Amino acid sequence: MGTHGSLTKAGKVRKQTPRLPAKQKKNYPPRLKNRLKYQVRIEKVASARA
């Protein structure tokens, strides 16, 4: 059974890629997140049709 390329080259690109610092994420509470999704999906579509 063959492989998809040489195992000696495994991880080559990942090792060469410079490490970037992690970005801060906005962690909304679930209620607020659901409300924002509702506004984007339903309220804006309904107002666009009217």
UniProtKB/Swiss-Prot annotation:
| UniProt signal peptide | none
* InterPro entries for this protein: Ribosomal_eS30
Protein family according to the UniProt entry: Belongs to the eukaryotic ribosomal protein eS30 family.
Name under which the protein is recorded:
Small ribosomal subunit protein eS30
Query: Where are the compositionally biased (Basic residues) regions?
Result: 11-28
Source species: Aeropyrum pernix (strain ATCC 700893 / DSM 11879 / JCM 9820 / NBRC 100138 / K1)
Q: Where is this region: Disordered?
A: 1-28
Q: Which GO terms describe its biological process?
A: translation
Could you tell me one molecular function GO term of this UniProt entry? structural constituent of ribosome
User: What is any Pfam family matched here?
Assistant: Ribosomal_S30
* TM region positions: none
Q: Name one GO cellular component term.
A: ribonucleoprotein complex
